[in-house]
Amino acid sequence: MPQHPKHMKSLGHLMALQRPTVWVDHFPVLEQLGEPPNPDKTLMVDIGGGFGQQSKALRSRCPNVEGKIIVQDMPQTLASAEPAEGVEFSEHDFFQPQPVKGAKFYYLRHVLHDWPDEQCVQILQQVIPAMAPESRILIDEVVIPVTGVPWQAAFMDLLMMESFASIERTRAEWEALMDKAGLKIIEEYYYDGKEQAILVVIPK
């Protein structure tokens, strides 16, 4: 894929269309924010954020909230990203230590479902040392029910298992994964009809 930038761009648009619902419309950003950061601080780091659609949505819907919004991804992905006012793009491998310290939100959308637990723990543990006491990790993923799973979530679960040896996770599985990483879920916000949720996570 890195050798075919046009295909990379198409893949990014396809991934955005698969989950068209915008997280920030269902998450109380201002309530969670508390005291707003000043312009020199970081509001959100969008880890593995692709073309930055979710970061652009946050900036668009909260134009008066100060603080940097930074999208991190691999260089071959960012090469196809379109610039946006108020959103920065930075090359970063999420298996390496998080370089941005003290952000309010460290946001991961559809990152962890690509990986089995061992790699997910590695990804999350790169973030923890960068967190300030007021920082929160936001995990935007499918949380599948134990029974009555929507067909979209069931299909994605099988696809993740076949393609990446990974899975879509239940609430209990997410909780167990966070525990392995030294984290805990303190709040959760469900939205859309596919069991999508934002899990608010802090160190134990």
From Swiss-Prot:
InterPro entries the record matches: COMT-like, O_MeTrfase_dom, SAM-dependent_MTases_sf
Induction conditions: The genes forming the sterigmatocystin biosynthesis cluster are co-regulated and induced on oatmeal porridge or the fungal isolates were grown either on oatmeal porridge or in YEC medium (0.2% yeast extract, 5.0% corn steep liquor).
Gene Ontology molecular-function annotations: O-methyltransferase activity
Cross-referenced Pfam families: Methyltransf_2
Pathway connected to this protein: Mycotoxin biosynthesis; sterigmatocystin biosynthesis
SUPFAM superfamilies for this protein: S-adenosyl-L-methionine-dependent methyltransferases
Binding site for S-adenosyl-L-methionine: G48, G49, D73, D93, F94, R109
Keywords of this entry: Methyltransferase, S-adenosyl-L-methionine, Transferase
GO biological process: methylation; sterigmatocystin biosynthetic process
Keyword S-adenosyl-L-methionine among UniProt keywords: yes
Knockout-associated phenotype: Impairs the production of sterigmatocystin and leads to the accumulation of demethylsterigmatocystin.
Record-listed E.C. numbers: 2.1.1.109
Substrates-to-products reaction catalysed: 6-demethylsterigmatocystin + S-adenosyl-L-methionine = sterigmatocystin + S-adenosyl-L-homocysteine + H(+)
Catalytic center residues: H113 (proton acceptor)
Family: Belongs to the class I-like SAM-binding methyltransferase superfamily. Cation-independent O-methyltransferase family.
Function: Norsolorinic acid reductase; part of the gene cluster that mediates the biosynthesis of sterigmatocystin (ST), a polyketide-derived furanocoumarin which is part of the most toxic and carcinogenic compounds among the known mycotoxins. The first step in the biosynthesis of sterigmatocystin is the production of hexanoate by the fatty acid synthase (FAS) units stcJ and stcK. The polyketide backbone is assembled by the non-reducing polyketide synthase stcA by condensation of the starter hexanoyl-CoA and 7 malonyl-CoA extender units followed by cyclization and release of norsolorinic acid.
PANTHER family named among the record's database cross-references: HYPOTHETICAL O-METHYLTRANSFERASE (EUROFUNG)-RELATED, PUTATIVE (AFU_ORTHOLOGUE AFUA_4G14580)-RELATED
Full protein name: Demethylsterigmatocystin 6-O-methyltransferase stcP
